[in-house]
């Protein structure tokens, strides 16, 4: 019996690729996604991520991972890297992932006005004194408008979380700048009404993201890659202008689109590779590798995306 039944047309999918200082063994990249487990069920979560690595994924990521108690999304199951106890929980996952030769990534998350902090009872930090914005959460909440000291604190909390991520064994550390959370608020001129160096012109509105990418790169110091998750949309030209200002800062771009129903829509209604055109336009602006999603199930489609230089993973 033939030992290798793989169609040689698909060999490119199994080629290794460098992501900054680390190398994925292939082009199969599990982007951050929720699991229903989070910090409450670390053993089950580690086993699930480990099964993915055993199945052949080159990179396996966590779900959104809070950097500080001011970003608490109870009762939704999120991950956390608040203190050293969380390092132990995450080490369970990274050990399982590494056991099968895959890289482990963590998506550091700052909530903003989409959260209520039902668990910690701390005021959520946002760009306005404003009721919380997540219409799926039927609890009253109020965001406290951030001042410069809050920005300074968040940068410190993010650096501290990146340090813990290294201690937990992660190979890729994210700056999470999409899906409506705090960094998205900075980008959006409708929510960012600041009059200081973090508001106004686009160069100012991307400043905080730029600082967090640079902070994270300094902390990981070549021991892990820095990824940035970011949205671009063909109907939003400024999203590409913002992307261009940051284009070569991280080691990897994890690109999506602003419309959740397209990014995560049912395959009955959303065609395979639905994000292709949006991602390609951004891909042409950066020299760094790009990963994206899009209900990809056909290896032929995956190969086409790589051959056409739409994305790298």
Question: What role is predicted for each listed range?
Answer:
Residues 1-313:
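Flavin-dependent oxidoreductase catalytic cores
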